[in-house]
Amino acid sequence: MYPQLPKSYKNAYPFRISAPSFIYPDDYIPNVQMLGPYLDEIELLCFESHESSLPSQETIRELESLAKEFKFTYNVHLPTDIDPGSPERKEKNRFVETLLRVMDLTLPLAPTTHTLHLPCNQAPIGRICDKAWQGRISESIRRLMDAGVKGPSLSVETLNYPLEWVEPILREYDLRVCLDMGHLIANHEKIETTYHRFAGQTTMIHLHGVNNGKDHLALDAFDQSWLDKIFSILKRFTGTVSIEVFSYNHLLASLAVLEKNMR
């Protein structure tokens, strides 16, 4: 039997509190059964695009039933093993086909958003955007829009490059933003500046600790000066905050930090 969270965090904050669907070392349904009674939202992780790694239609039906039973919502993290900026046409086709398939599969769950990675694989990563890469990203997103995807349903996550690199694409297709605080801090970005610039487009914040280059740790990995900066943003935010850690102990410690700093 897995340990339960000590109390409910539903409607506790100005934002919706979320956690990933792999907190416990088990499949989707056991995780959602354990987390659903305590949280506003669950981040359904679909990191891998292979059919065997995705939830089945039967699992989706059960996940839909659990959301109704425990009164929570889902957000979906789209696959990360596909590359919309690839120079290879085959890879860009796979990106479009995969996202359409996963979004169709999870449609019954009425996700609040779909979190999307737009990886930049140029090396070394500098401060100058590769315009050819930017153009390929734009083409891939346009193909999604042509297939019927609505721009506001996608939240582009901050990764290992400045979000400004894709800002023209965000504007052109009316995309939303997922601010991953851990990634911003690890990449030495100014979180307050980035938040102010993209606050109107930000629907999702990913929250996890960072220490010595390692991320997705519990929030107690941060010293108080970092926590003060993070929570000055969270206290003004009304979207979804997903504590993006992958173990019960890290989630429990993070929820304690959250509760202490939101007083």
PLM-predicted stretches and their roles:
Residues A12-P14, P37-E41, E69-T73, T106-T113, ...:
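A general structural motif
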Residues F15-S21, D40-L44, Y74-L78, H114-L116, ...:
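Hydrophobic faces of well-ordered beta-strands that scaffold small-molecule active sites
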Residues M1-L78, I82-R101, R263:
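N-terminal pre-domain/capping segments
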Residues P6, G85-V177:
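Active-site acidic/histidine proton-transfer and metal-coordination neighborhood
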